[in-house]
Swiss-Prot record:
Described function: This is one of the proteins that bind and probably mediate the attachment of the 5S RNA into the large ribosomal subunit, where it forms part of the central protuberance. In the 70S ribosome it contacts protein S13 of the 30S subunit (bridge B1b), connecting the 2 subunits; this bridge is implicated in subunit movement. Contacts the P site tRNA; the 5S rRNA and some of its associated proteins might help stabilize positioning of ribosome-bound tRNAs.
GO molecular function: rRNA binding; structural constituent of ribosome; tRNA binding
One of the Pfam families matching this protein, by short name: Ribosomal_L5_C
A Gene Ontology BP annotation from the UniProt entry: translation
Protein name per the record: Large ribosomal subunit protein uL5
Intrachain disulfide bonds: none
Gene Ontology CC terms: ribonucleoprotein complex; ribosome
Quaternary structure, from the entry: Part of the 50S ribosomal subunit; part of the 5S rRNA/L5/L18/L25 subcomplex. Contacts the 5S rRNA and the P site tRNA. Forms a bridge to the 30S subunit in the 70S ribosome.
Length: 179
């Protein structure tokens, strides 16, 4: 089992129960899933780019990504409905905890000119979204084998009812928010 999951059960639950005066352990917010999304708009011209992006996402997450397709045609972007334009992975359970641990301790500190993550990226329901400009911050990606630098979106979905609870949950995991 991931160390971060044990830490959540032993430390974070107790801390949040006293902070928010919950009656039951089941009221304490928890991380439900982590979604990684990589939009590859250039895949319209070159299908190989999407395969490389999917390979990067597989290396980062340890799970085969789902190829996302365009919902509707947009003439300005030269895409038709059903064109493959990106890939995404939804992590839950053990893989989610392992990825979350690597994200906090290894990947985020490797971001260039890192001064902390914005605490304003919550959606109103306790879920946190962040964008990463370079996939090479993850140690699983070999810098020499990267065909081009791509960014990805990371969404951490929690069971928190409000942004305040979500922020308290992520702060308990030592999530590096900007002061």
């Amino acid at each position: 089992m991931a160390k971060l999951h044990d830490y959540y059960k032993d430390e974070v639950v107790k801390k949040l129960m006293t902070e928010f005066n919950y009656n039951s352990v089941m009221q304490v917010p928890r991380v439900e899933k982590i979604t990684l999304n990589m939009g590859v708009g250039e895949a319209i011209a070159d299908k190989k780019l999407l395969d490389n992006a999917a390979a990067d996402l597989t290396a980062i997450s340890g799970q085969k990504p789902l190829i996302t397709k365009a919902r509707k045609s947009v003439a300005g972007f030269k895409i038709r409905q059903g064109y493959p334009i990106g890939c995404k992975v939804t992590l839950r359970g053990e893989r989610m905890w392992e990825f979350f641990e690597r994200l906090i301790s290894i990947a985020v500190p490797r971001i260039r000119d890192f001064r902390g993550l914005s605490a304003k990226s919550f959606d109103g329901r306790g879920n946190y979204s962040m964008g990463v400009r370079e996939q090479i911050i993850f140690p699983e990606i070999d810098y020499d084998k990267v065909d081009r630098v791509r960014g990805l979106d990371i969404t951490i979905t929690t069971t928190a009812k409000s942004d305040e609870e979500g922020r308290a949950l992520l702060t308990a995991f030592n999530f590096p928010f900007r002061k």
